[in-house]
Amino acid sequence: MGCVTSQEDKAAVERSKQIDKSLRMDGEKAAREVKLLLLGAGESGKSTIVKQMKIIHEKGYSQEECLQYNPVVYSNAIQSMIAIIKAMGQLKIQFGHPDRAEEARQFFALAGHADEGEMSQELSGIMKRLWKDVGVQECFSRSREYQLNDSAEYYLNALDRISAPGYIPTEQDVLRTRVKTTGIVETHFTFKDLHFKMFDVGGQRSERKKWIHCFEGVTAIIFIVAMSEYDLTLAEDQEMNRMMESMKLFDSICNNKWFTETSIILFLNKKDLFEEKIKKSPLTICFPEYTGANTYEEAAAYIQLQFENLNKKKDTKEIYSHFTCATDTNNVQFVFDAVTDVIIKNNLKDCGLF
């Protein structure tokens, strides 16, 4: 009888061990599954971060995939020139050369009939001459007074290259393309033994109602702010400062009851554009109370503090902040490596394994 009981006890102990082992394996598996939500206002750089994940953690863009971006590159370059020339009328800026006004009319006519995925030599020739005009350059230097794609200068400076026969976009060209994200774009990749699911959500106000069902079971939120937009207004609301809109959105995400346990990672993005802009456009445009110097270091630290101060649970919740340039692959790789280490540590802690 005692022998039978002993065998039953052994079996029960063995079963208990198996259950513990299974639970531990489930815990470890859960700790290796990471659901990342990319949030931020429109044009903050979320989609560029997703493209970088493909370059860094997958095989990058094949020649065929790069070729598919031809129409987007051409469209971005043409739309940038259209925006600048239209703004010249609004800002009452004259062309530096008398011939350019007629060429601007030709440009609009050619741009309106350009085949998608093609840029004729005639069109690119006119665009190159317009781009060199002192009036066009003056208008470009005042781009904070109207809506202009961040990549305008990059593409317009590269017109020789991008309009050449047989042009294939480089990965940097692809990274710089701008297409408004509508809906939710999901990306999967593996890094440091973790299985990532990254969700890029449209940032414009009209897209935000679609975020809600993505929130369940999120491991971390990467909130992206375009630092360089401190002196700009929203495309969808000309009265609203873009930085203020970002702060409002960050406040609602950071202090949301659903995200009490969620790691919040703050990417202060477009640091390269910010570093150039702060030399000529004071931070007081956005923060009238700012009394520091208009240097990159002081102004960037002030912006970081403004966002981190929105956190109402400083004693229990940490904001992990990083300065980023989403178009710089090395910078994104370095930052994402640090972010992943934080996620691993927090995941193991949540699963009782740390």
From Swiss-Prot:
Mg(2+) binds at S47, T181. GO terms for biological process: adenylate cyclase-modulating G protein-coupled receptor signaling pathway. Pfam families: G-alpha. A lipid is attached at C3 (S-palmitoyl cysteine). Residues 35-48 are annotated as: G1 motif. Residues 32-354 form the G-alpha domain. GO terms for molecular function: G protein-coupled receptor binding; G-protein beta/gamma-subunit complex binding; GTP binding; GTPase activity; metal ion binding. GTP binds at residues 40-47, 175-181, 200-204, 269-272, 326. Keywords: GTP-binding, Lipoprotein, Magnesium, Metal-binding, Myristate, Nucleotide-binding, Palmitate, Transducer. A lipid is attached at G2 (N-myristoyl glycine). InterPro entries: Gprotein_alpha_I, Gprotein_alpha_su, GproteinA_insert, P-loop_NTPase. G proteins are composed of 3 units; alpha, beta and gamma. The alpha chain contains the guanine nucleotide binding site. Belongs to the G-alpha family. G(i/o/t/z) subfamily. Guanine nucleotide-binding proteins (G proteins) are involved as modulators or transducers in various transmembrane signaling systems. PANTHER family: G PROTEIN ALPHA I SUBUNIT, GTP-BINDING PROTEIN ALPHA SUBUNIT. This is Guanine nucleotide-binding protein G(i) subunit alpha.
